[in-house]
Amino acid sequence: METLTVGLGDRSYTIRGGSGILPGIGAFCRELGLGRIVAVVTNTTVGPLYYGPVADSLAAAGFSPLRVELPDGEEFKTSATMNIIYDALIDGGLTRDSFIVALGGGVVGDMAGFAAATYLRGIPFVQVPTTLLAQVDSSVGGKTGINHPRGKNLIGAFYQPRAVVIDVETLTTLPEREYLAGMAEVVKYGVVLDPQLFAEVERNITPILARDRDVLTRIIMACCAIKASVVEKDERESGLRAVLNYGHTLGHAVETLAGYGTFLHGEAVAIGMVQAAKLAEHRGEATADDTGRLRALLESLKLPVELPVFAAEAYREVLLRDKKARDTGLSFVLNNGIGGFSIVRLRDLSEVIDVCGIGG
């Protein structure tokens, strides 16, 4: 098992990663000094697979677990689904001494974390991500929230977990499409922050596709270390943390226009990264070889790279509603070659529309 710490003063927490560590979650939560009643928020896909061993471990450690099972899918990341969680917490008698375990992928983690942030004005929660995307990205850093029909993640809060527990064994039951979508976030870290990680993914396509546990543990914890370093410097996304939105600006637009659930989040990010690379190339911050290398890696991971066709005005409208849009324009993260980045603010989206071939 590997461990690392996200250093945020009195809100610091530990990330534990390895193979076969899920049965130890009860003892780990006991070490944290958490209250007796725990709501395990999961979904209809993950619950039948992993709620049993998690609940058994928690019960053996002296906790009283409550099962809260949600429908599975990005399309259910809504206020209506949040009320399912709130109702269960109220009916289960959870108090400020109680806590939540988020057992699932990014949607479960975002909603369970938002419930923890808002129920009784805040109770502790522990992230137990079971998808690759959640393990390398959304479970670390404290972003929680839900979607709105007019945009993704428009409602939410920054609220840090008490701990993150990553068991790569959970990836053995992950559908192929979701697993590969998670690799998009791994590639993201390499493109803008770590050229060595990018090269390692290029070298290890075969073991990655075979879900080699040792390779995955190494790559996942490397991503978590990068994410932790960024969050420590910029917890609330006022500066450096914005780099983690590489590929997300157009990616979120793709998700919104296509309808939540049409593209998996990682698939949309893969598309967005290629478009960001085109923009970087157009501005002289990357070469055609850099863009080609990124595109080839994503394609080798069986990820989409082509922007779906919607009217230019539809893209423009969704982009301007992006939560990263401010009075000074819309923030875009661009790659500087492989391993570097810059952040530009665009008042006029015509350049993006022209370079990316939007609407055509």
Curated annotation (Swiss-Prot):
Subcellular location(s) of the protein: Cytoplasm
Gene Ontology terms for molecular function: 3-dehydroquinate synthase activity; metal ion binding; nucleotide binding
Keyword list, A-Z: Amino-acid biosynthesis, Aromatic amino acid biosynthesis, Cobalt, Cytoplasm, Lyase, Metal-binding, NAD, Nucleotide-binding, Zinc
Pathway(s) it belongs to: Metabolic intermediate biosynthesis; chorismate biosynthesis; chorismate from D-erythrose 4-phosphate and phosphoenolpyruvate: step 2/7
Cellular compartments per GO CC: cytoplasm
Main location: cytoplasm
Positions bound to Zn(2+): E185, H248, H265
EC numbers for this chain: 4.2.3.4
GO biological processes: amino acid biosynthetic process; aromatic amino acid family biosynthetic process; chorismate biosynthetic process
Cofactor note: Binds 1 divalent metal cation per subunit. Can use either Co(2+) or Zn(2+).
SUPFAM superfamilies the record matches: Dehydroquinate synthase-like
Keyword Lipid metabolism: no
Obligatory cofactor(s): Co(2+); Zn(2+); NAD(+)
InterPro entries xrefs: Dehydroquinate_synthase (IPR050071), DHQ_synth_AroB (IPR016037), DHQ_synth_fam (IPR030963), DHQS/DOIS_N (IPR030960), DHQS_C (IPR056179)
Keyword Amino-acid biosynthesis on entry: yes
Catalytic reaction equation(s): 7-phospho-2-dehydro-3-deoxy-D-arabino-heptonate = 3-dehydroquinate + phosphate
Binding, NAD(+): 72-77, 106-110, 130-131, 143, 152, 170-173
HAMAP family found in the cross-reference section: DHQ_synthase
Role: Catalyzes the conversion of 3-deoxy-D-arabino-heptulosonate 7-phosphate (DAHP) to dehydroquinate (DHQ).
Stated family: Belongs to the sugar phosphate cyclases superfamily. Dehydroquinate synthase family.
Name of the molecule in the record: 3-dehydroquinate synthase
Gene label: aroB
